């Protein structure tokens, strides 16, 4: 039997249809033979063979009819097989689509995680940038402050050049010694105390010199300002005490009577104010101003007491 009703690959679902086709093919032996010979071929090849049989005039009509029913059975079988293949392809495509959907979901989740990570990194980078900008601003402020200090330090005159210097170690009215007083100063004060009232006599002896110097100052400083000396400078205090300051540099001494200029009655004895001017800078001196002090260390000077120095 060419066809079996229980065969699912035949493509027929009803047994009576299969029986009718088998009956038609069985009218000639070429019908079942044509069916079995062409069962593994494609429909195009089966159709070509059937066309050749139908066009042949020598082939009997019974053979042509049996081969035609066999071709019909083969066509149904090929259609059923093609449907199965198509269903398998559809299933495969559906599975592939599901795989694509799952992959798309995974990629979407990965993309979401990546976006969150990038946002976190961006926020962290922004925070680090803000910290860096803050640190940079602080460093720039420190740099500007250091530049400002350096600029002031460059503009400020060097210490000890062209400035009035008050020598340390002078005795106060109460008899206390300032920090830096040497042994020679203490011995000089002790000797002055032993001498008693000789201090006023020394001031009286030293009196004309400051007056002459002041007279020279009033005359436009055409005469020398004072004595340029080297070695030990003798400074007189309020109580007739004397301290010695050792130096090796040439100085110019300005002698001035405070009570003669300010008229202060509280000044019992004259003060000697010394302005140290190093010799290389004597020619650079243009203006100077002295400030007299009372015996208690208070300033009593005024603008009218200033002396203007001409070019030396």
UniProtKB/Swiss-Prot annotation:
Pfam families registered for this protein in UniProt: TEX13, TEX13B-like_middle, TEX13B_C
GO function terms (MF aspect): mRNA binding
InterPro entries: TEX13A-D_N, TEX13A/B_middle, TEX13B_C
Domain of life: Eukaryota
Tissue occurrence: Testis specific.
Coiled-coil blocks: none
Family assignment from sequence similarity: Belongs to the TEX13 family.
Protein name: Testis-expressed protein 13B
Organism of derivation: Homo sapiens
